[in-house]
UniProtKB/Swiss-Prot annotation:
Keywords: Metal-binding, Nucleus, Transferase, Ubl conjugation pathway, Zinc, Zinc-finger. This is E3 ubiquitin-protein ligase ARK2C. The gene is Ark2c. It comes from the Eukaryota. Its EC number is 2.3.2.27. GO terms for biological process: axonogenesis; forelimb morphogenesis; innervation; limb development; motor neuron axon guidance; muscle structure development; positive regulation of BMP signaling pathway; protein catabolic process. It catalyses: S-ubiquitinyl-[E2 ubiquitin-conjugating enzyme]-L-cysteine + [acceptor protein]-L-lysine = [E2 ubiquitin-conjugating enzyme]-L-cysteine + N(6)-ubiquitinyl-[acceptor protein]-L-lysine. Belongs to the Arkadia family. Residues 23-79, 268-289 are annotated as: Disordered. Binds free ubiquitin non-covalently via its RING-type zinc finger. Ubiquitin-binding leads to enhance the E3 ubiquitin-protein ligase activity by stabilizing the ubiquitin-conjugating enzyme E2 (donor ubiquitin) in the 'closed' conformation and activating ubiquitin transfer. It comes from Mus musculus (Mouse). InterPro entries: MBR1/2-like, Znf_RING, Znf_RING-CH, Znf_RING/FYVE/PHD. Its main location: nucleus. The keyword Cell inner membrane does not apply. The RING-type zinc finger mediates the E3 ubiquitin-protein ligase activity and binds directly to free ubiquitin. Non-covalent ubiquitin-binding stabilizes the ubiquitin-conjugating enzyme E2 (donor ubiquitin) in the 'closed' conformation and stimulates ubiquitin transfer.
Length: 347
């Protein structure tokens, strides 16, 4: 057994060591995996030095067996002194199986974190495609445990939102291309109808849950569509049409009085103009006197012999004018007293 000093770590190496005076050299094996192999010995293509077994803990790689077989056939004496070894930078290397217990537990913790991150990315394939293309090195394991342990992502990133893609990837807003709007959102833009919007809490929660996974630029586009004045004008027009249809279904609600009620509670007669006394003097023709009366509905002066109607409140109107008014409302146009209420109070 040889103790290899790697930075501040002391790693045991089992097996024979050839060319003990040769420097510690690193070479990369052309496997499809991200593992790197370390050889002890001079850089000779014919000789094979013992390698670290870098296969994954569960499955074995057949490409490593042929490469590792000659390493176990060498035997020799272990020497007590070793030449100083340069400090190696371990990056993207999985932990060997012969690590001490503390490092082995740390290695297992890293594997669990990587598996959890992989499951989270697989559960959201849309985010997985974008992120793997931009950061392909995130899924590679690393031997530098102190820097590889990643902090948990915020909740809004773990739930599948996509508006952090341009920031994560370092892209400018011009480079971040907006994807086409899905078909199930087209009807919100094509036909601005008020009945398309949800009116209860359950449907609102469903729409909010779907829009939460919606990209930010397209949400901005939806907000701009909501600021279009034509949409609000159309909504107001349709709301007024709905009120007209409701009025047709309910019918005309009449709050006026029928003709029999009008005749019963009012006093119709022929108007006779009051004459002023001669002692007070005569006024010029065309000038109104204090005794002249006016119909406040048509704003015309009352003339002698016209058909008038006096209400219980003693206000006087033209008969035709006040009959049309009382057919819509039973209250006096001036004092707003109901003709039936006034009669009942006096009696």
């Amino acid at each position: 057994m040889v103790l290899v000093h790697v930075g501040y770590l002391v790693l045991p190496v089992f097996g024979s060591v050839r060319n003990r005076g040769a420097p510690f050299q690193r070479s990369q094996h052309p496997h499809a995996t991200s593992c790197r192999h370390f050889h002890l010995g001079p850089p000779q293509p014919q000789q094979l030095a013992p390698d670290f077994p870098l296969a994954h803990p569960v499955q074995s790689q057949p490409g490593l067996s042929a490469h590792m077989a000659p390493a176990h056939q060498h035997s020799g004496t272990l020497h007590q002194s070793l030449t100083p070894l340069p400090t190696l930078q371990f990056q993207d290397v999985t932990g060997p199986s012969f690590l001490p217990q503390a490092l082995h537990q740390q290695y297992l913790l890293q594997q669990q974190l990587l598996e959890a991150q992989h499951r989270r990315l697989v559960s959201h394939p849309r985010r997985n495609q974008d992120r793997v293309s931009v950061h392909p090195h995130r899924l590679h394991p690393s031997f530098d445990f102190g820097h590889q342990l990643q902090t948990p992502q915020p909740r809004y990133l773990a739930e599948g939102t996509d508006w952090d893609l341009s920031v994560d990837a370092g892209l400018s807003p011009a480079q971040f291309q907006v994807r086409p709007i899905p078909q199930h959102y087209q009807h919100y833009l094509a036909t601005p109808r008020m009945h398309h919007f949800p009116r209860n809490s359950s449907s609102t929660q469903m729409v909010v849950h779907e829009i939460r996974n919606y990209p930010y630029p397209q949400l901005h586009f939806l907000a701009l569509q909501g600021l279009n004045p034509s949409r609000h004008t159309s909504a107001v027009r349709e709301s007024y049409e709905e009120l007209l249809q409701l009025e047709d279904r309910l019918g005309n609600v009449t709050r006026g009085a029928v003709q029999n009620t009008i005749e019963r509670f009012t006093f119709p007669h022929k108007y006779k103009k009051r004459r002023p006394q001669d002692s007070k003097g005569k006024k010029d023709e065309g000038e109104e006197s204090d005794t002249d009366e006016k119909c406040t509905i048509c704003l015309s002066m009352l003339e002698d012999g016209e058909d008038v109607r006096r209400l219980p409140c003693m206000h006087l109107f033209h008969q035709l004018c006040v009959d049309q008014w009382l057919a819509m409302s039973k209250k006096c146009p001036i004092c707003r007293v109901d003709i039936e209420t006034q009669l009942g109070a006096d009696s």
